[in-house]
Amino acid sequence: MLADKTECISRSELEILQLERLKKIVAWAYERSVFYRRTFQSRGVVPDDIRTLADVRRLPFVTTEELHSVDALDFLTLPLSSIIRINRRDEFTNLYTKGDIRANVEMMIRALMAADVLRGSIAGILGDFADSRFLDVLYALESIGATVVPLGTDCRRWSDMIELFSLDTLISTPQLIMQLQKSFELPFTKIISLNTSTIGNDLQTRTSAKVFSLFAPPEVGHAGMMYRCADAAGHHVQEDFFLIELLRFGSDEPVTIGDAGELVVTALTAQAMPLIRWRTGQAVRRMGDLCTCGREFIRVATP
């Protein structure tokens, strides 16, 4: 297994790190974000109320509807002069600091290496770089030392580029992968799919390549929040960057390990646009056993 040390730290060490980051992000959002200060005050919550990880339940939820209807600048914690990237995808705007981009790339490096994308891999990126997730993929591939071939979105060029450079890995969205598959037999050994609405792996039934799906909804602003490892048993959650809860739909009650619940996400390090207790609407269950790959991060799977 190729993994960084954080993926393998003990549960107790990880929870200490999560609590430290949770306290910081709650204080940061309260002090800097118009939206979160307003919602925290309406709930009667202040940053000092967060003393344990369980205290995250004191905080109000944010819904997908709110994320899409509230002005992005109300979530913003910094002046635009501190923002180095703005991306709009699926009618949702993300803003990033240098630190946010660095975290994105670190998470993507882990996700790619978990899929056995290594130095010497030849990876094609099929997509429009106006979708900034592909920029994170590009930077991560270059950091690993893989050879990168941007394929763009012009389907007339795809087959020539793929054959010319003998690509072994394809990274794209499910929609573009299926579009390519309609006109071209996919020669890759690995396909990495950036999924927005489900963490499922439906593409695996359509190709002989090994498919690694990532959960990458636009609201999160990261392409690698959850990733499959080479053992392909559920999705690892990047727990040093995200705190997740699995709750009964329509309530604040947690489900027991093994039962399906609604995925609720808190981003622990997002600087420009904090994301605290987002109810995703995605049903998942936590897998109770440790993964055979050796990573300590918990895994989730669709019911």
Q: PLM ranges: what are they?
A:
Residues 1-114, 118-119:
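Nucleotide 5′-phosphate-binding alpha/beta core
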Residues 1-13, 17-30, 34, 144-303:
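Active-site glycine/GP-rich loop and adjacent strand/helix microenvironment
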Residues 78, 85, 125, 170-172, ...:
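Redox-cofactor binding/interface segments in oxidoreductases and associated redox assembly factors
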Residues 95-99, 143-148:
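Glycine-rich phosphate-binding "P-loop"
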Residues 101, 128-130, 175-176:
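Short glycine-enriched loops at secondary-structure junctions
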Residues 105-122, 155-167:
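Conserved ATP-dependent adenylate/AMP-binding module captured primarily in the ANL superfamily
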